[in-house]
Amino acid sequence: MSIEKKILYIQSSVDEEFRLVVNDQWKSTESDHRSKIRNCIEENFTSRFNRQQLAWLNDLNRLPQAEDGFFSIAHCKTLGGFTYSKHPHGFDVEQSSRISTDIIQRTASAKEQAAAPHLSFLWVGKEGGYKALSSTRADLVITDLLCTEWQSHFENQVFSFRLNSLKTLDFGLNKGFIFSEADNLFCIYFK
């Protein structure tokens, strides 16, 4: 199944305006990958920003902030990209083969590991959730997030999940999606 059909499923579930843009020229091993991603955002989403936000977009130490919608950026050794949505969200992409059992054991409870469809889903799910939620709690760490309520949407080759935490967080939509493409795992978590 194509990545486009997986995105259509996410659009129909949460946000028709959701966009995912990835490119292997934006992988983390490319020296200017971060600038290239932001250039693409600027070229294709200019209308979403006011003048000051456009100027800040070129500051690699700032997260992109738009007047109209939200962006999230991710990259790994094979590709990089960004997402856009009307809803606050976090995006992560990882090479499946690089997610180790050790990292899962350090960041996920035994109960989470037993419930997850694939152990590697826990890492990208928590990363996507952390990106979406960390701006509301400065003391938030990955281990504070618990991935729950896994569902398989096999006809779309997508899994969904929700997050819980012992810390008080504003979850709102609280809907995450994970899918794979080649050796890459993608997560989009809507706060």
Features from the language model and the residues they span:
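Core catalytic alpha/beta fold that binds nucleotide/phospho-ligands
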Residues: 1-191
